[in-house]
Amino acid sequence: MITKELEQNMRKSVEAAQRNFNTIRTGRANTSLLDRLTVEYYGADTPLKSLATISTPDSQTISIQPFDLSSLVLIEKSIAMSDLGFTPNNDGKIIRINIPPLTEERRKEFCKLASKYAEEGKVALRNIRRDAIERIKKSEKESEISEDQSRDEQDNVQKLTDRFITEIEKNLSDKEQEILKV
């Protein structure tokens, strides 16, 4: 009945949680750390990746080469003012960010942040489940489907929810292992 749409919505919630996980630092240089960074460029907040080429020449360095050299200082300022905790090094053509090794305390903070993102994803899944079950009950109330069909549909919704929650928990476990690996 509504399984296809429901599955798509739940998949989007899992993907959103995964995107959040990708923004968490692990001690290795990763371009996704800068995915959410915006730069005020000609009066508009512009995503960094549309202003520069971002690469990782080695496991401890992120390199940012702007398409327009006049934006170099703006990019540097944006990185320095962000909550990422990076200190950009500007050599006039390229900005380099050295990724320091994580302290044990920072690793624990990042694990807590990952848990928070996972919980947000699970809450989103539960909200989608609640809405779907309400629609099923409404259909049953209006005699569009039988009580047995309603129960079967609700069971299917619950199984789908459980499957996606398990997927988020697995992604969280993988991310925590990645964060805690020294």
Curated annotation (Swiss-Prot):
Provenance organism: Prochlorococcus marinus (strain MIT 9211)
Region entry Disordered, spans: 137-158
HAMAP family, per the entry: RRF
Endoplasmic reticulum is among the record's keywords: no
InterPro entries, A to Z: Ribosome_recyc_fac (IPR002661), Ribosome_recyc_fac_dom (IPR023584), RRF_sf (IPR036191)
Chief localisation class: cytoplasm
PANTHER family assigned to the protein according to its UniProt record, in alphabetical order: MITOCHONDRIAL RIBOSOME RECYCLING FACTOR PSEUDO 1, RIBOSOME RECYCLING FACTOR
GO biological process, one term: translational termination
Source lineage: Bacteria, Bacillati, Cyanobacteriota, Cyanophyceae, Synechococcales
GO CC aspect terms: cytoplasm
Designated name of the protein: Ribosome-recycling factor
Function in brief: Responsible for the release of ribosomes from messenger RNA at the termination of protein biosynthesis. May increase the efficiency of translation by recycling ribosomes from one round of translation to another.
